[in-house]
Amino acid sequence: MCIRDRHIARTLIDRGFNYHVTEPGPGGSDLFTARFGNIYSARQLLQLARRCYGLFQPQDVAWTRPDGRFVDPFRPQIEPDGYASEQAVAQALPPHLAAVRRMFEESHLFIFTVGLTEIWESTVDGAVFPVAPGVVALPPDPSRYRFVNMSVAEVRADLAEFIGLVRQHNPDLKILLTVSPVPLVATYEDRHVLQATTYSKSALRAAVDEICRHHAAVDYFPSYEIITSWHNGGAYFEADLRSVAESGVAHVMRVFERHYLRTVDRPAARQDAALRAEFARASKILCDEEALDTGR
């Protein structure tokens, strides 16, 4: 989740649907359903589900920021001020995972945007992180991590395992997948970032397509195609050719509403201006990947 899912959530709120929040942020902020931060890869999503059901316990608990504060390496920017100690990071984890578990078990529809095939993982236990070690904080031993660029088969397998796991606990759960149209800001591979972006988006789109063909409870929403298709000549990107313009977001949400919210018994649109304003304010949170730009 980084930009697409927030706009979908805001549209659902505006139309009176229940955007299910199991772990509110400070001041009641509902930017994330639970406070997991941005999730970019299928592997990261799968591991979060496995962790909340006690199937995986990574050895990494806390990393250290340059200012001496500590962060949860799996959601490094969820607490802007960081934590005072490693123990504080560990103590915040059980209630968080319980909230994630409730999210999976109490939801009717789960919407997820896959954004990256490039991941950083621990060589000790395979744990995957949203940003590379050192971008936001440093682990005790930086040599125990490696870069991996996932294949179509690996993304497909991770998504399939995730779907099987969460629907085992919530058989009625439906899943809507999208692919992020936002290009990579950088790549660790020895090739141009344009090549890396083309591979990543192609692999994700192919994997998601195969998943949807084999899972009746899963659908695909083409926000990627709407934003990046040649027919609009790049008009849906800002001047940096990376950020999605408001006109593109509006087009995506019109299509989403037309095809997914058109029901005769849907709740009346909520006229809660304060709620919409708070969601818009909270949505300005820095994406983890954009932290790569802050050090340049």
Question: Language-model segments: which ranges?
Answer:
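Short, small-residue-biased leader/transition segments that mark boundaries at the very start
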Residues: 1-3
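Short active-site loop/helix that positions an aromatic residue
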Residues: 8-15
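Active-site-surrounding "flap" and adjacent substrate/cofactor-binding loops of secreted or lumenal enzymes
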Residues: 15-40
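Short, Φ-rich (hydrophobic/aromatic) sequence segments
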Residues: 35, 42-50, 252
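A basic- and aromatic-enriched beta-loop-alpha substructure that forms the phosphate/nucleotide-
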Residues: 47-90
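Alpha-helical cap/lid subdomain in secreted, periplasmic
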Residues: 73-296
